Amino acid sequence: MKRPNVLNLTCPAIPVVRIGFVGLGNRGILALERYMHLEGIEVKALCDLRKENIERAEHILREFGRPEAENYSEEGMWRKMCECKEIDLIYICTDWLTHTDIAVYALQQGRHVALEVPAAMSVADCWRLVDTAEETRRHCMMLENCCYDAFALTTLNMVQQGVLGEITHAEGAYIHDLRKHYFADEKAGGYHNHWIKLYSQQHTGNPYPTHGLGPVCQWMNIHRGDRMEYLVSMSSRQAGLSAYAGQVFGASSEEAAQSYEMGDVNTTLIHTAKGRTILLQYDVTTPRPYSRHQTVCGTKGFMQKYPVPCLLLDEYGKEPLSGEQFERMMEQYKHPFTAVIGEEARRKNMPNEMNYIMDYRLIHCLRNGLPLDQDVYDAAEWSCITELSERSVRQGSVPVEIPDFTRGNWKER
C-alpha cells in the first residue's frame, strides 16, 4: 500500500498555538524574543541544559508580561517536554546534530515541529523526518528565513507571473566572513571549542546549504513540478582559518596549528529533472563581502541581489534597469508577504523583517489550518546537500544522485 504523502498537508486550526522552545542559546533566545511580538501564541515550555539560558528566557517572558512557562533543564528532559499534551508546536534551536532526533520524537508525540537550519545532517536523517511526518500527519517546517527576504520574494512573484520567462539556471550561496568567530568565545557568539568548529575539522563539502538553496528551489518549483536529480561538488583546499590564526595568534600558536577538513570554498552544481541547473556556494573563511547570490536566469530576463540588486528584462534592452524604472518594477512586483507582513514588522521596529515574516506565516498557517509555506520535503531536499556534497568531494567530484523524497509525487504538482 502506497504511503500517503504530506504535500499540501492541512491540520485542524489551532486558535492559540502553544509552543515549547528547546535550545535557548544565541539563536533560540532571539527566536523567543521575536515571538513576544506575535498574536495567538503562548509559550508553554522552555528547555535548555544551561540554567542561565533558562533564566534569560524567563526574564524575557516577564518583561513582556507573558505567563510563566514550565522549564526543563536536565539531560534528556526535552523528551518529557515533547510528551506534554498542552504543547502544539516544538520549536528546535539546538545544535545541528540533534535537530533530527528531537524533531522525530516530537512528531511521534503528535506535535508539530519547527526546526532551525539545517534540518538534518545526513540523508538517512532526512528520510527519518519525511517518514515520520508522513506517518504522523504532522507539520515539520525547517526555519529557512532567507525564503522571506524581500528581494527573494519579489523574484518569486516575478517568476510565477512569467516576467522572467522560462527559468533555466539559478544561483545561491552562503558567503559570510566568520573567521573571527571560529576563535571567539561562545558567550561572545563565537565557535571556539564549539560544535560548529568541530564539524569543520571533521567534514568537508557544504554543511550549510539551505540559505542559498531555499529561495532557488522555490523559484524552480522543486518537488512541485520539478526535482533535483544529481549534483557534482568540489572544494578548495583549506587555508583561510590557518592564515587568520597565524596572523592573529602567531604562527606557532595552538590556534594556527589546528587542522580542518572543510575547504575554504565549496562549489556545488545541481541538475534538475527538467534540465535546469543550480550553482550553490559556501564560504565562511575568506575576506569576501557577504553574499547569498540570489541569481536567476530566464529566457526573458535576469535578476540578482548580490553584490548589488540587478534586474535586466529583454523588453527593456541590454542594460539593467536603473533609477525610477528599477524601483517601479520592484514596487509593482512586491510580494504580498513583504507588502503586508513586512510593513507590520517595520511598524513594530523589528530588527529583521524576513524573520518576522517567517514567524508570522508559520503561526498564521497553524492558526488557520493552512498548508505551511515550507514542508518536510523542502527540509529534506535542501538539507541532504550537506552529506551528498561531502560524498562527491571525497570521491573526486563524481556525480551523486539526490533522493526523491516525494517518492514520485513531485510530478503531480
UniProtKB/Swiss-Prot annotation:
Substrate binds at residues 174, 208-211, 290. InterPro entries: Gfo/Idh/MocA-like_OxRdtase_N, Gfo/Idh/MocA_oxidrdct_glycsds, Glyco_hydro_109_C, NAD(P)-bd_dom_sf. It is an enzyme of class 3 (hydrolase). Keywords: Glycosidase, Hydrolase, NAD. NAD(+) binds at residues 26-27, 48, 96-99, 116-117, 145, 191-195, 208. Binds 1 NAD(+) per subunit. The NAD(+) cannot dissociate. Its EC number is 3.2.1.-. Pfam families: GFO_IDH_MocA (PF01408), Glyco_hydro_109_C (PF21252). One of its GO terms (molecular function) is nucleotide binding. Its cofactor is NAD(+). Gene3D superfamilies: Dihydrodipicolinate Reductase, domain 2 (3.30.360.10), NAD(P)-binding Rossmann-like Domain (3.40.50.720). Belongs to the Gfo/Idh/MocA family. Glycosyl hydrolase 109 subfamily. PANTHER family: BCDNA.GH03377 (PTHR43818), GLYCOSYL HYDROLASE FAMILY 109 PROTEIN (PTHR43818:SF1). Glycosidase. This is Glycosyl hydrolase family 109 protein 2.
